[in-house]
Amino acid sequence: VKTTTNLATLGMAVVLCGPTIGAARAEDWAQFRGPGGHGRSTTSGPVAWSRDENIVWKAELPGAGASTPIVVGDRIYLTSYSGYAVPKEEPGDLDQLVRHLLCVDLKTGKLLWDKQVEARLPEPERIRDHGYAANSVVADSQRVFAFFGKSGVFAFDHSGRQLWHAEVGDGTNGWGTAASPVLFGNAVIVNASVESQSLVALDQKTGKEVWRAKGMRESWSTPLLVPVGDETELVVPVFEKILGFDPQTGKQLWSCNTDIRWYMVPSLVADDGVVYCVGGRSGGALAVRAGGRGDVTDSHRLWTGRKGSNVSSPVYHDGHLYWAHEATGAVYCAEAKSGEIVYEQRLERAGQIYASALLADGKVYYLTRDGRTFVVAAKPDYELVGVNELRDGFTFNASPAAAANRLLIRSDRFLYCVGK
């Protein structure tokens, strides 16, 4: 059954009530790239769909955005922006820029609430490609946290009531802001590289600053929490390096040279204490074992490679890494142990791919900017399982999310629930 909802027309008239949010479930897609930030789902995913087939519901959004939908219980949270640069061809007045935090019912696609946040100006007048709502939100059973760059970090409860607001810097960049917050202990941690070249931890209850680590140069990546024995490290790629921190204190523990020039956008993945990086403007990849101290380039860096991606993040599965090049439409499989490229396959008429890869039920999903999803078997031998189109005339920059054996895919105009 397919339903279409216009969220923009529902607006603030929607009552702020709904089901109580229970304890967060392990399968909840409660942050950017889902559980652990690895882009891996424990549920199965659909294989075939189109604009008219296997669409559970389709909801029109009140604005554009590149943030990934997240899911907690039976609620979806995502951000968008309106008032300026929508459409891009007639941008209008920057003073009218508004950001939205949206809460949508997972089962029906109906809007439960829309919290509007005024932008702290000035912002770059034309953030290329992805606009003003690229940071995905993060949530637990009590709160929802949204990061809007220089406008700050906002905490809401699940009824949409704002709890606090904290600023983490006033810097801007022509590419805007994109890193998503993560939760650790009682803190919400943001990569404020654009805003203050800092990594900032805020108290989840009050928004007060817990710690701040400097040196976050030219990084748009979402931090990754990596288990190392009985401890946990917070790992982030920056200009020419990967840095490891103690998430309790913000103390830098180690650094590893990447030999990758210029800025970092893709986020990291890890398995069994090994961190994998695929990214950088100049391209490249590497693996480094977490848990070291000081400069670990010689002692813990396991391999480097020349193939990478400037935008989309990889997934790890069964000893292999899978990712897409953002510009060429090529997808890669590499052996995680050695970095050796197993295959490089160009997807037919793929165009640009900004969304990060998603793994579900032994399949890797690659979503292109024009709304085509290539489903590829997650195995060393390349096998194209299917190609599915949702072209709606708008851009698909956001990474897909998985929930209840379905996919959530958003464009700059619509949010789709794909499945049966």
Placement of each model-derived feature along the sequence:
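Bacterial N-terminal signal peptides
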Residues: 9-20
